[in-house]
Amino acid sequence: MTTLLNPYFGEFGGMYVPQILMPALRQLEEAFVSAQKDPAFQAEFTDLLKNYAGRPTALTKCRNLTEGTKTTLYLKREDLLHGGAHKTNQVLGQALLAKRMGKTEIIAETGAGQHGVASALACALLGLKCRIYMGAKDIERQSPNVFRMRLMGADVIPVHSGSATLKDACNEALRDWSGSYDTAHYMLGTAAGPHPFPTIVREFQRMIGEETKAQILEKEGRLPDAVIACVGGGSNAIGMFADFIDDTSVGLIGVEPAGHGIESGEHGAPLKHGRVGIYFGMKSPMMQTDEGQIEESYSISAGLDFPSVGPQHAHLNSIGRAEYVSITDDEALEAFKTLCRNEGIIPALESSHALAYALKMIKEDPEKEQLLVVNLSGRGDKDIFTVHDILKARGEI
């Protein structure tokens, strides 16, 4: 099929879907390309981001975390966005696209529940029906977000197959869409999946990096030495990285979840520890068994518990433009507690992975003068019960 936009990032990406979905993807690509050139669409999207979601979000300088060091650390506060995370940015864009295509229903998948909440709020606002697939295990560990979705009128459908987590929810959502795309739009939650989703999601998250660049230049008069973001599927990270890719002086650092440790096999770090394969409609690194079956991923944070990664991250890694590292559950939990106690900000466990790596960089060389920005992709209200149970089991509370 001829596409309007390049479906690949280097060797990664593509449209590996059943033939039945090709017309839906083509229609979506056409709607996106025309919307990008339509001033009325852009004006409505910008208005929603500003007056409904609360953009621009703050760039907060840490007062206490860097004390006694020569690092200056800023947090890009996506946690302050309506809905509690960066997810709200791109769902507003996709919901407007759905309406532009004449769709009346939204199908979505969610892991941590943040994309589900964002999808539910966008549908409530714009008058769309909403059904959300969520792994049964994730429903258990993210009950506040499940209730939020239902409060806003969404139908939350538990998925019991496989590991009952995000990858299984993705499979069910795609299955649903293949039979309902005449009336429904699949609102994919991350910068992964078949073309054109990775490009659409990046463009609808790009303002994170654009705002960060303008804000840091205003506050510090120069670009940061590095921007750091957690990577599951990779939407918050690509939103932060996109506007800095051509600024080669700026390091791009993506942080995957090492879970219980890479050597344990219980992690979610396919970029550095997976093999290239085809899954979820794309060619990208993924966690596989020796037989080529998709392996279960694991992370303390439901939003990073995904066995593959967006194709643009795979490309940035392959050409050496971005560096990808990993952080364990314990390191993320420590960073979570550190930010709470030292700055009065409760971060999402996902974002805590990025913060943990920044703190590691600072600790390794306290005398190094460096300007760092961490994308605080979401707030941690959804995680307080998980953290409470862990700390209680350890006798820390």
UniProtKB/Swiss-Prot annotation:
SUPFAM superfamilies noted in UniProt: Tryptophan synthase beta subunit-like PLP-dependent enzymes
GO MF term list: tryptophan synthase activity
Organism: Enterobacter sp. (strain 638)
Family matches, as PROSITE patterns: TRP_SYNTHASE_BETA
GO CC terms: cytoplasm
Family: Belongs to the TrpB family.
Pathway the protein takes part in: Amino-acid biosynthesis; L-tryptophan biosynthesis; L-tryptophan from chorismate: step 5/5
Keyword Cytoplasm in record: no
Gene3D superfamilies: 3.40.50.1100
Modified residues (N6-(pyridoxal phosphate)lysine): K87
Name this polypeptide is given: Tryptophan synthase beta chain
Stated role: The beta subunit is responsible for the synthesis of L-tryptophan from indole and L-serine.
Top EC class, one word: lyase
Catalyzed reactions per annotation: (1S,2R)-1-C-(indol-3-yl)glycerol 3-phosphate + L-serine = D-glyceraldehyde 3-phosphate + L-tryptophan + H2O
Description of how the protein assembles with itself and partners: Tetramer of two alpha and two beta chains.
InterPro entries assigned: Trp_synth_b_CS, Trp_synth_beta, Trp_synth_beta/beta-like, TrpB-like_PALP, TrpB-like_PALP_sf
Transmembrane segments: none
Keyword presence, Transmembrane: no
Entry keywords, A to Z: Amino-acid biosynthesis, Aromatic amino acid biosynthesis, Lyase, Pyridoxal phosphate, Tryptophan biosynthesis
EC number: 4.2.1.20
